[in-house]
Regions:
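N-terminal targeting/export leaders
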Residues: 2-72
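Exposed aromatic-hydrophobic patches
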Residues: 9-18, 219-222, 369-372
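Exposed beta-strand face motif in extracellular beta-rich ectodomains
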Residues: 20-24, 176, 228-230, 319, ...
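Extended terminal and domain-junction accessory segments
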Residues: 69-139, 242-276, 352-423
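Short beta-strand segments of immunoglobulin-like
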Residues: 128-129, 164-169, 307-312
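Histidine- and aromatic-enriched segments that form or immediately flank copper-ligand environments
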Residues: 137-252, 330-361, 380-397
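Short, polar loop/linker segments at the starts of domains and inter-domain junctions
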Residues: 149-163, 279-297
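Histidine- and aromatic-rich segments of cupredoxin/plastocyanin-like copper-binding domains
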Residues: 200-213, 286-422
Length: 423
């Protein structure tokens, strides 16, 4: 019990309460000097988190479940061909979480799906930078690839056999043409996240265009009126197509030299997670998505499609980092402990005033741009630190995952940017 003080007329500021759950009691006492409250409780208040309660254990023990609810929560309902080799298994669980045995036996009510491919499929390769100018044409192909991942060979999707898809650099105001060929076994489109464009080319199936069938082709005409960081991905069965690798970044350059404060270099990072087990990818639902509302969390965190990101910088270097969260449902909370960081831009472009921050919270589809200065030699981690939730016991717990390491050399960076960075 923590005493907060005497209640008087007017408003009393308590300050931050750093507790996961709390209840506030106001009691009527004979004197404000009492050490232990004994009077009648006249007011009771509680944090919203106190409403978090464990489920009815008896319900799960006997294996009772509700009927399957509607899965039509994605942009387009597409039934995929079930995979002969795919099977439902127990989903990997974090080491510090438990599920009841009856709950662990539950399986989705739809057939499992995984993409199928033979040995002739190309190997996925890292993304390439494509610099486009006004009037250029970009040709993209959505197809299947083989990908080496943590000692396994996975069949996944890719634009132009690249994972992530090609990184596009475009000058502000440019107009380009994109020809998309669908080499998948299912319909698809491309949505250009955040770009103000002609509605006909927004990529929303059955609203702004008809989805491209397998073997089909569609031509997008795009104009980029705003500088900033954007990304592209399908709007058909995102739970499958985006999760399997159909995404890429677009960096639209401003003609202004002072659009951002100075930095020594830029890094463009796409954040994702992937759900895998000992057999490879955990299957998706063939008839419908198997995860709704909270979505499908992965158990391996990725930066630019790979676990354990690594970057080599010099002491004193200022790095401009463009972050894009392409995961289905995970919100990231990123920081660089021991390095100074300020946020300079977001989804809609640069900020009028840069702000110092300890971390940045990035929800799915969001983008942020930060400047980080690495002052001292050594290793700086890039952790994701969140307050996670144990639904079984109704409790919060701390979770920390390291996405990568920045290795800072003792050699000093050319050009001291401390004056402009410190403003």
């Amino acid at each position: 019990v923590r005493r907060l003080g005497e209640v008087r007329n007017g408003r009393r500021q308590l300050g931050a309460i750093s507790l996961d759950k709390f209840i506030i009691l106001v009691t009527a006492e004979r004197s404000a000097r009492v050490k232990e409250p004994t009077g009648r409780i006249v007011l009771r208040g509680a944090s919203p988190s106190t409403r978090l309660q464990p489920p009815d254990l008896m319900q799960f023990t006997i294996g009772a479940v509700r009927e399957a609810e509607s899965h039509d929560m994605q942009h387009m309902h597409v039934t995929l061909a079930p995979s002969d080799s795919a099977r439902w298994t127990t989903v990997p669980m974090p080491a510090n979480l438990q599920m009841l045995p009856a709950e662990m036996t539950l399986r989705p009510a739809v057939a499992p799906y995984l993409p199928r491919g033979d040995s002739s499929l190309p190997r996925a390769r890292p993304r390439e930078l494509i610099r486009l100018t006004n009037g250029d044409t970009l040709r993209l192909r959505a197809g299947l690839v083989h990908r080496a991942f943590k000692g396994q060979t996975l069949t996944m999707f890719a634009f132009n056999d690249q994972y992530p898809g090609p990184l596009l650099h475009v000058p502000q105001g440019a107009e380009i043409t994109v020809e998309l060929t669908n080499a998948l076994d299912q319909p698809t489109t491309i949505h250009w996240q955040g770009v103000r464009l002609d509605n006909r080319f927004d990529g929303t199936p059955d609203l702004t265009q008809q989805p491209m069938p397998p073997g089909g082709r569609f031509i997008y005409h795009l104009r980029f009126p705003d500088a900033g960081i954007y990304w592209y991905h399908p709007h058909v069965r995102e739970d499958v197509q985006q999760e399997l690798g159909l995404y890429g970044n677009m960096l639209v350059r401003s003609p202004r030299a002072d659009y951002f404060s100075p930095a020594h270099r830029e890094e463009i990072l796409m954040l994702d997670d992937l759900l895998v087990n000992d057999d490879g990818l955990v299957p998706f639902g063939a008839d419908a998505a198997t995860h709704a509302l909270m979505g499908r969390f992965g158990n391996v965190l990725l930066v630019n499609g790979e676990p354990r990101y690594s970057l080599l910088v010099k002491s004193g270097e200022v790095v401009r980092l463009y972050f894009t969260n392409v995961s289905n449902t995970r919100t990231f909370n990123l920081s660089f402990p021991g390095a100074r960081m300020k946020i300079v831009a977001g989804d809609v472009g640069n900020f009028e005033r840069e702000e110092w921050v300890e971390s940045i919270v990035i929800a799915p589809a969001e983008r942020y741009v930060v400047h980080v200065k690495f002052d001292r030699a050594g290793d700086v981690a890039l952790p994701n630190r969140v307050q996670a939730l144990d639904h079984l016991y109704g409790r919060f717990y701390y979770e920390r995952d390291t996405l990568g390491i920045v290795h800072v050399e003792a050699a000093r960076a050319d050009g001291n940017l401390e004056a402009s960075f410190a403003r």
